[in-house]
Amino acid sequence: MDDVPFLKGHATRNDFVILPDHDDELELDAALVRAICDRRRGLGADGILRVVAVPADDAPVSSAGATADAAAGRPPQPSAGRPPQPAAARWFMDYRNADGSVAEICGNGIRLFARYLVDAGLEEAGRFLVGTRIGPVPVDVPPAGDVTAWLPAPELRGGGRARFDGRMLEGVRVSVGNPHLVCVVDTLADVDFTRAPVLDSDEFPDGANVEVVEIERPGVLRMRVYERGVGETWSCGSGACAVAAVAEGAERIPRPADGWWRIVVPGGELRIRFDGDRVALAGPAVVVAEGRLHLAALEKSDG
């Protein structure tokens, strides 16, 4: 394949390249991912969303960390105020970080992925499932406006630490299908994000996204994030869910009156609400461009 179609979009300025590959024909190796995501020699992005059709007789990919229903290929049981769940995912989100590594889930990425499916006429507006490496994830996509993903409820896994340029921060380890460390500080501006935080390899054998959080007012938190395999980004959806989970269980953090946590990131605002074994992640997601990508030119580019 010399030329492939692509789209570019973002969710609170967490930007992605979308590669429609319905028949699973594209060989997306780490070097190609790095070249595409490079902001000088490629398109530039925080990651890649490859769109693959799920065969009718195949179940979405699952893994440890998914809830029991997701691991079995079933949608979660509906709860009060939520519509009935669809039966199966028709599309699989193959997500890659900008460094070429494979990631379990991406909260902002799945919302953009879902927006693309509706805009492209591959799914109807409303609720449907997206297949991911942590199991099928329900999404709510209106014809226009914010997109909501219902991720598995985060799991708090005890304390952890990260060193930012000589400053040690204590935090809470969280799994949202992917690993996070949430650290609450008095002032975000005091934390140096110019270098990658150093993590304990015993606590995080596969690395982690590190979220640093400042309390703004009841129900509103400010967050910066250093994503594994990417660097500091303007937003991180699964990170916002991890932050809200820590806040939900912390007595010293004032809770929101309406149940929705507002997580303010450099790229905008995300809204988080807990409902049983799921957490709703809501916010904007928009496709801004499309075209064709010349793979041969990328492969011949320097470095």
Curated annotation (Swiss-Prot):
It comes from the Bacteria. Residues 75-86 have a biased composition (Pro residues). Pathway: Amino-acid biosynthesis; L-lysine biosynthesis via DAP pathway; DL-2,6-diaminopimelate from LL-2,6-diaminopimelate: step 1/1. Keywords: Amino-acid biosynthesis, Cytoplasm, Isomerase, Lysine biosynthesis. The active site is at residues 106, 236. One of its GO terms (biological process) is lysine biosynthetic process via diaminopimelate. Residues 60-86 are annotated as: Disordered. InterPro entries: DAP_epimerase_AS, DAP_epimerase_DapF. Signal peptide: none annotated. Residues 60-74 have a biased composition (Low complexity). The record marks 180, 227 as: Could be important to modulate the pK values of the two catalytic cysteine residues. It is found in: Cytoplasm. Disulfide bonds: none annotated. GO terms for cellular component: cytosol. It holds the Pfam family DAP_epimerase. Catalyzes the stereoinversion of LL-2,6-diaminopimelate (L,L-DAP) to meso-diaminopimelate (meso-DAP), a precursor of L-lysine and an essential component of the bacterial peptidoglycan. Belongs to the diaminopimelate epimerase family. This is Diaminopimelate epimerase. It comes from Acidothermus cellulolyticus (strain ATCC 43068 / DSM 8971 / 11B).
